[in-house]
Amino acid sequence: ITPSSPMAEHVDAWSAHGRKNLFGQPVKLVEMQSEAGAIGAVHGASEAGSLCSTFTASQGLMLMIPVLHRLSGQLKPVVLHIAARTVGTHTMSIFGDHSDVMGCRNTGFAMLCSAGVQECADLAAVAHLSTIKGHVPFMHFFDGFRTSHEIQKIHTVPEEELKKLIDEDALYEFKHKGLNPEHPVMRSTVTNPDMYFQSKEASNIWYDRLPQIVDEYMQQINTLTGRNYKLFNYYGAEDAEDILIGMGSVTGAVQETVDTLNKQGKKTGYIQVHLYRPF
């Protein structure tokens, strides 16, 4: 779905040409009848112990919401890459805002925002690494068209370096729990309120740990690249009296505005949000 389609098209091309992933395995790409089918396939594959990802935006993301609750409740290491786009209301629009991802804030997914092309490359890795170690599924989102279709030169982290960052124990645990007809189990059954509440609250331990896990991976990416990613990056005067908070492609324009205002003697700053959920 526009404007996320190019991501899936690139993966399709890589898969067709036999490009392998970090584990030296060919990537299987499946095209479904709709976004509802796509996220259902992701759910099923993750239940079998496969690491999965998909790409979507806007109305496509809205169709996925019922299964997003399932994925987060079952603590599946899944990443959605979202080129954030307006959700159609009185009319349709293919252009960017955050109305689609904002509609998913209560799904239990962690939400990581990139402001530019280089950040997309780096923080996509952070999302995939963090979901394996942290057990919480991720939405990695960035602005549709403004960022998703921007052409920039970037510096990528070598694959052999990324592979070293994978938590092998957490990955083994996930794969070991995959459904297997040789060892049948039953999951996601109906429970009464007493057990439902207890089991739901039990997952909070992973949400409490997640910001630290994301921060640790950001620091490791910083070490490899020389860049400076934090959960929240501050830019501007140390003694700022006026501070703007934002995320996404607005960052560059706001930073230029902060520079201009500070040169005029004002004390201003900007807080860029990367990890929006859990907040």
Each model region followed by its residue ranges:
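Short beta->alpha junction loops
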Residues: L29-Q33, I271-P278
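Conformationally flexible catalytic loops at phosphate/diphosphate-handling active centers
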Residues: F23, V27, F138-N233
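Thiamine diphosphate
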Residues: I1-G103, G108, A125, F145
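Short helix/loop capping segments that flank catalytic or ligand/cofactor-binding pockets
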Residues: M64, H90, H149-I151, A253-Q255
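A general structural motif
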Residues: T91-I94, I213-Y229, G246-V254, V273-F279
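Short, solvent-exposed amphipathic alpha-helical segments in soluble enzyme
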Residues: V11-S15, H69-S72, H128-S130, H155-P158, ...
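Conserved thiamine diphosphate
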Residues: I94-G144, E168-D169
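Redox- and metal-dependent alpha/beta enzyme cores, enriched for Fe-S-associated oxidoreductases
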Residues: L231-Y234, E238-K267, F279
